């Protein structure tokens, strides 16, 4: 059994009683786990598996596949502020989508976990801005090795899109909404 800090990216139904849970972890990279019995009323996972939660997880690695068994979850930070505002939730979901596109499963990248943790910490306390989204994309492009701010003035999102073949479809509507929010904030001052 192995333990690591992790942020819950996505969860979906596997069976009547179990869930498949995707995590961005500090020690193992982005992984998928099966939470057996998580959908039962008296599950030890009850209240601990929600989107964007940070937790200390214990897993048993699978020898046959990339679907590991989740054995324990200790909630560290629910990032509750993200859920207080639709735009914060939308931005966090975009960050998760972007990470899922730009990373391979089970590829250890501690910088990626640290970036997502900082981003969620920011969204937990602040409303998102175009600048915050751009910073996240720039840092992700730097981690992926496709953007060096000193050498390139190019758009880091464009570099990520070229490397991985696409960007999340949610990017354009998110940026439009953030730009509209910024204009309305500036005009009310």
Positions of PLM-derived features:
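Non-catalytic alpha-helical scaffolds and adjoining flexible linkers that form interface surfaces
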Residues: 1-189
């Amino acid at each position: 059994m192995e333990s690591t800090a992790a942020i819950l990216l996505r969860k979906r139904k596997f069976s009547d009683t179990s869930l498949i849970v995707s995590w961005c972890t500090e020690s193992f990279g982005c992984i998928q786990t099966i939470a057996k019995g998580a959908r039962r009323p008296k599950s030890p996972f009850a209240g601990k598996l929600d989107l964007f939660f940070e937790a200390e997880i214990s897993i048993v690695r699978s020898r046959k596949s990339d679907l590991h068994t989740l054995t324990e979850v200790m909630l560290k930070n629910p990032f509750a502020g993200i859920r207080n505002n639709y735009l914060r939730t939308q931005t966090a979901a975009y960050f998760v989508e972007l990470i899922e596109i730009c990373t391979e499963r089970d590829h250890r990248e501690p910088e990626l976990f640290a970036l997502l943790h900082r981003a969620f910490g920011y969204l937990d306390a602040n409303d998102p801005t175009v600048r915050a989204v751009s910073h996240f994309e720039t840092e992700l492009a730097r981690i992926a090795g496709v953007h060096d701010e000193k050498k390139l003035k190019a758009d880091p999102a464009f570099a990520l899109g070229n490397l991985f073949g696409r960007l999340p479809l949610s990017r354009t509507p998110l940026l439009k909404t953030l730009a509209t929010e910024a204009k309305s904030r500036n005009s009310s001052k």
